[in-house]
Amino acid sequence: MHCPFCSENDTKVIDSRLVADGHQVRRRRQCLACSERFTTFESAELVMPKVIKSNGNREPFNEDKMVGGVQRALEKRPVSADAIELAISTIKSQLRATGEREVPSEMIGNLVMGQLKELDKVAYIRFASVYRSFEDIREFGEEIAKLED
């Protein structure tokens, strides 16, 4: 690792600790040339799969788009920000766990519905009605009946 003070290549690690619930390593380093100390953080590069849209187009995973859909469904519902963050994190972990480089958008929608079903049934119905393009009240009733089973 290059020293940020003198740009020398030789540095040594003085101390290493896990931080961010074990998702990062904090390293205290010292330059062997100028003796300055500095801190680095190391974390895994987590690459999200590309999304295959229903029309066949491929695009990068857009977390903001997913979060927006979840937040719209949960608008004015009694669900904490922490619970929402955990649901988003769970969905992203499930997507990475597939090991696939590309996933269909339908899979993402189903994962979102699964999390919403656990968080809040009303939000689930809201999301499902848009995602599945409900045409009439009968479709709402059928989906609600499935929830009651």
From Swiss-Prot:
<dbReference type="InterPro" id="IPR055173">
    <property type="entry name" value="NrdR-like_N"/>
</dbReference>
<dbReference type="GO" id="GO:0005524">
    <property type="term" value="F:ATP binding"/>
</dbReference>
<keyword id="KW-0238">DNA-binding</keyword>
<keyword id="KW-0804">Transcription</keyword>
<dbReference type="Pfam" id="PF22811">
    <property type="entry name" value="Zn_ribbon_NrdR"/>
</dbReference>
<keyword id="KW-0863">Zinc-finger</keyword>
<keyword id="KW-0805">Transcription regulation</keyword>
<comment type="similarity">
    <text>Belongs to the NrdR family.</text>
</comment>
<keyword id="KW-0479">Metal-binding</keyword>
<protein>
    <recommendedName>
        <fullName>Transcriptional repressor NrdR</fullName>
    </recommendedName>
</protein>
<keyword id="KW-0678">Repressor</keyword>
<comment type="function">
    <text>Negatively regulates transcription of bacterial ribonucleotide reductase nrd genes and operons by binding to NrdR-boxes.</text>
</comment>
<keyword id="KW-0862">Zinc</keyword>
<dbReference type="InterPro" id="IPR005144">
    <property type="entry name" value="ATP-cone_dom"/>
</dbReference>
<keyword id="KW-0547">Nucleotide-binding</keyword>
<dbReference type="GO" id="GO:0045892">
    <property type="term" value="P:negative regulation of DNA-templated transcription"/>
</dbReference>
<dbReference type="GO" id="GO:0003677">
    <property type="term" value="F:DNA binding"/>
</dbReference>
<feature type="domain" description="ATP-cone">
    <location>
        <begin position="49"/>
        <end position="139"/>
    </location>
</feature>
<dbReference type="GO" id="GO:0008270">
    <property type="term" value="F:zinc ion binding"/>
</dbReference>
<keyword id="KW-0067">ATP-binding</keyword>
<dbReference type="Pfam" id="PF03477">
    <property type="entry name" value="ATP-cone"/>
</dbReference>
<dbReference type="InterPro" id="IPR003796">
    <property type="entry name" value="RNR_NrdR-like"/>
</dbReference>
<feature type="zinc finger region">
    <location>
        <begin position="3"/>
        <end position="34"/>
    </location>
</feature>
